[in-house]
Amino acid sequence: ANGGTPASFNLSLNRGTASDRLYSRFVVAVLTKDGYQEISKPHYITNPELVAPNQNPYKAPLSKKGLQMEISQIGDAFQLGVKHSSVNIAFHQILGSGIDYEYDGKVYHFSKPVIESYDATISAMSNKDITVTAIILNGWNPATPDLIVPGTTQKSNVFYYMPNVTTQAGFEQTRAIAAFLAERYDGSNPDYGKVSNWIIGNEINNQQWNHMGATSISNYVQTYQDAFRVFYTAIKSTSANDR
């Protein structure tokens, strides 16, 4: 059969406003006498890097020698010639007070001393040509239950939990955290530093490190995929060539 006539559409993303469409799904629909009828499956934006203010090239490691470290180990890293390193950034540690961040008309609060500690660590590394990878983790925090997938309970032998974007409140909070971190560590401020690589969750095939409780494999994978997409969109729409 012959294909239809090609068509293109333009619309504003309204980025940074309460009606932000950057994370929305879109469908093609036709107008019928009964209203609009969907004729395509929903699709998310797949190229958020096009709107990223930071279009700088990816910072590739200058060597394969790497180390996961803290600020107290910086001197050792320099002596060893380390050129890439990773840091853990956990939700339950970075939320608090002292830094207010507005996103889509809502204000979110981050711990000033904790964030400044990350600033010192990340900037010390990236300013010395060490490529930095951030590992994003979701620790249990009774003060922020919306960050945990509903139905998940705290376990003594579990270290971290699946990020929650399955509810509107969880989606909004997770999105704000992702956007804050992506903007904070985009390299524009040398006092904050530059994160070039992002790992969302840790050992996601291990229930102790990305716990969600009893569920099917397909539901677990879909939930992780949805959370990953939020971070991917936040990161790539800020720094186009981050990985």
Residue ranges of each PLM-predicted region?
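Extra-cytoplasmic beta-strand recognition segments
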Residues: 9, 67, 130
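Short linear motifs at secondary-structure transitions and domain/linker junctions
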Residues: 3-7, 40-45, 58-64, 172-176, ...
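Ser/Thr- (and often Asn-) enriched beta-sheet segments in non-cytosolic proteins
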Residues: 8-12, 79, 234
